[in-house]
């Protein structure tokens, strides 16, 4: 069973300024919004600020219908736009169950139909994949969206078993909807990086859109641990794909709100996963977001490798202190900068809060 709900909305506060999606093409994303719907202190306005950067999201780890409705309502109140949601039944092998959801901006995307939960006769998946067909209102481009949350399990082998089963599911999608075979997109949290050997069967017919970076937030600010989230498309796809990447949402929230979001706060209040996205050709992310991504991708200032001039970009670090940092190498942790004359507790906290200084492995 699937559930589709749509409602009207009115504007209260614009949190982002995006071009009219109906006049451009789409921004598609996949996001594991950790335990969406549980009473765990989720900051729905913050989640909505990130979700509003896109026109369509495939969401994993939806714990109940109330959670996805609340996110939709927050998006509508914040953007003044109408958003719709389609979600699966609760899926799982035991008392722990999750839903999948598709969430989209009505001005940009139309639900075409064909919502299906995979009939997993071999019981290979703990949570069977969910799919539906959509189209861009601006260009009439159709796409068959499918989403899955691969089990983490007790061993990597548990994940590999499900990853290998994706090939049969991928072929099944083409069999049941052959008219959309070239327009399939598999959104998900796969709990396995795309270069792992377990993907061999899928790699024969499909390709990941994100191959560099990482999507899971580490406990260290501005550091990401694993590339688990991704989007897969057919090798012979007919989709108008543009840029794809990872949205480092703690950086974006820090910029948009004016309040620093460290990884501890981001993991507790939003998610321990960053969204991955793909843009259809002719589209871009919001300019401020693009700038922040560029800053993030530019990398941090490594205390053990940066030049004196690069070190002076850090707060409270002039040429003399930069020379002292260079002379004090190797550094084991950013907190050790307190050994530099003139860097007291307050200045050290500001350096750490900016998230620009690091110790690269």
From Swiss-Prot:
EC number, UniProt record: 3.1.-.-
Annotated cofactor note: Requires Ca(2+) or Mg(2+) for catalytic activity and the maximum activity is achieved when both of these ion species are present.
Cellular component aspect of the GO annotation: extracellular region
GO biological process: DNA catabolic process; DNA repair
Signal peptide region: 1-24
UniProt-recorded Gene Ontology molecular function terms: DNA binding; DNA nuclease activity
Effect of residue 149 to A: Loss of catalytic activity, is unable to digest DNA at any of the tested concentrations of NaCl
Active site positions: 149
Named cofactor requirement(s): Mg(2+); Ca(2+)
Keywords tagged on the record: Calcium, DNA-binding, Hydrolase, Magnesium, Nuclease, Plasmid, Secreted, Signal
Alphabetical list of PANTHER family matching this protein: DEOXYRIBONUCLEASE, EXTRACELLULAR NUCLEASE
Function recorded in the entry: DNA nuclease able to digest short and long DNA substrate. Is resistant to ionic strength and thus active at high salt concentration.
Family: Belongs to the DNase I family.
Note: Thioalkalivibrio sp. K90mix is adapted to extreme salt concentrations and grows at salinities up to 4 M of NaCl.
Name of protein: Deoxyribonuclease
Species annotation: Thioalkalivibrio sp. (strain K90mix)
Lineage: Bacteria, Pseudomonadati, Pseudomonadota, Gammaproteobacteria, Chromatiales
């Amino acid at each position: 069973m699937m559930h589709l709900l749509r409602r009207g909305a009115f504007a209260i506060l614009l949190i982002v300024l995006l071009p009219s999606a109906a006049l451009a093409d789409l921004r598609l994303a996949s996001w594991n919004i950790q335990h969406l719907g549980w009473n765990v202190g989720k900051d729905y306005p913050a989640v909505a600020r990130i979700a509003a950067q896109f026109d369509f999201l495939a969401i994993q780890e939806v714990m109940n219908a109330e959670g996805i409705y609340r996110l939709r309502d927050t998006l509508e109140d914040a953007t003044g736009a109408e958003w719709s949601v389609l979600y699966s039944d609760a899926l799982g092998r035991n008392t722990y169950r999750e839903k999948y959801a598709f969430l989209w901006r009505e001005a940009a995307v139309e639900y075409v139909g064909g919502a299906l939960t995979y009939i997993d006769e071999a019981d290979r998946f703990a949570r069977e994949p969910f799919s539906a067909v959509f189209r861009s209102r601006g260009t009439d481009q159709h796409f068959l969206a499918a989403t899955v949350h691969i089990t983490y399990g007790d061993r990597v082998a548990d994940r590999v078993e499900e990853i290998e089963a994706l090939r049969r599911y991928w072929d099944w999608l083409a069999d049941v909807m052959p008219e959309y075979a070239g327009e399939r997109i598999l959104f998900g949290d796969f709990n396995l990086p795309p270069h792992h050997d377990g993907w061999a069967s899928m790699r024969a017919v499909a390709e990941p859109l994100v191959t560099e970076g990482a999507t899971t937030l580490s406990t260290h600010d501005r550091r990401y641990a694993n590339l688990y989230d991704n989007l897969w498309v057919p090798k012979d796809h007919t989709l108008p794909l543009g840029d794809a990447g990872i949205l480092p949402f703690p950086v974006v929230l820090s910029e948009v709100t004016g309040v620093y979001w460290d990884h501890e706060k981001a993991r507790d209040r939003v998610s321990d996963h960053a969204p991955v996205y793909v843009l259809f050709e002719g589209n871009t992310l919001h300019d401020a977001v693009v700038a922040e991504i560029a800053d993030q991708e530019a990398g941090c200032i490594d205390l053990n490798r940066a030049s004196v001039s690069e070190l002076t970009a850090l707060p409270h670090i002039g040429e003399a202190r930069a020379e002292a940092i260079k002379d004090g190498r190797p550094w084991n942790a950013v907190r050790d900068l307190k050994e530099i004359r003139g860097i007291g507790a307050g200045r050290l906290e500001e350096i750490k809060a900016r998230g620009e200084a690091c110790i690269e492995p």
